Structures are given as structure tokens and as C-alpha cells.
Amino acid sequence: FAIANAEITSAQLVNGTPSSTKQVAEAELQISGQGQASTNIQSNTTWTFSFSIGETANMVLSFLANPEMKADVTLVPPYTAGNAQANMSADFTLRRISQISGDAATPAPFVNWSPDGVNTNAVCVNVGSCVDVDPESLNETMGVGPGNSTVTHSLGTAGSNYSLTITGLTRGNYSLTLAGLTSVNVTQVPEPGTLMLLGGALAALGFGGTRRRSQATAA
């Protein structure tokens, strides 16, 4: 079977109340073939905040996330081979979409941030400065197989605090978007007439005090 689901909670920022998202994708394979599931939050349509600033301003984006991933292949005779893969990605984009009426034309600020566990990796254009804190990577692809093997990412750890501080945003109308993706894929590689592989996979993504988890298994 394969299932996927997504939830956006308190999507509107009101009186300091944080927004949060949850994603889950799960697949289990018990016969010859392939199982796959994915959940995708497309920022252009489902997670966009629009706001205006009347003078040069600074912005701080902060959230709690817990990226947990596991991919595992454990073979039990007569099973001979299997593959399991889990993926997660997160990407934030801030852009000025228009200027205030009557203002002289100025270069449009643009910021893109894909937390990868390395600080100072945000792309910042036409702003004063950018400082990002990425305790762990939120952009990972993990896979194992065809033999017995296991690989994990941040499994069993507590959530971490992430932040992006931007200075020198000019007057104008802005949008802040999030694109998040979780996906899993399990495949059996049979010897003709001899192999039945049990495979499973699980992936989930959460922001704003929620857990982010990704797991793939094959046995």
C-alpha cells in the first residue's frame, strides 16, 4: 500500500501565532514490484504569506524542526535483494513582488534559503545582510541496498532551532513561501520464482514545533 497526507495548521500569521505544517508519506511492499509515496507542499499555492513594509526594515524567520530519517534493508532467506529510499527537502523564498506606488524604482530584494546543516549558505540579493542558522540539514536523500544495510539521519534526536535574519529590506510588497517535500520508494529485486520481498517506507515533514521524520525500510 501507499498513502500520503499533508496538513497546514494556523496558516495565517496573526498576533504572533506561529504557522505549522505536517507531511507524511508511507509505502509498504509485500509482493514483487515497487512501492512509492510522496507528499508535496507547493509554496506557490498553499503556503504563501504576503505583507507590506512602509520603510526599510529587518526580518527574522525562525522555527523548530526535527529531521529524522532511516533507510534499511534486512534480508531474510529466501529474500535476496531490496532497495529503500527516503527523501526530504525544504526551501524558503522571500521576494519583493512590487513597490509602493510613487516610489522610485530600486533593485528588488530576493532571498532563498535551503537549510543544509551549514550556516551562511542563504542566497541574499539586494538586502543589507543575511545570517542563517542551520543546526541540521532539511534537504537529504538516503538510499540503501541491494544487500543488508542501514543508514540514518538525525534519528532519535530532539528538534533544533533554525533562524534566518535579514536586514535592509526596502519598502514594498513581499511574499514569503515554503516548498516542502517528503517521498519514499521501496523496490524488490527478485530472483525469478524464488523471492518475495517485504518492503516499507515512511517519510514525514513538520515545521513550527512539529516533528519532521523520514524512514524507509525493506526486509
Each predicted region: which residue ranges?
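C-terminal cell-surface anchoring/sorting signal
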Residues: 195-219
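Helix-boundary and membrane-interface capping/anchor signal
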Residues: 1-188
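Short, threonine-centered small-residue motifs that mark membrane-proximal processing/anchoring sites
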Residues: 179-204
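Generic low-complexity segments that are intrinsically disordered, proline-rich and/or Lys/Arg-biased
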Residues: 147, 191-193, 216
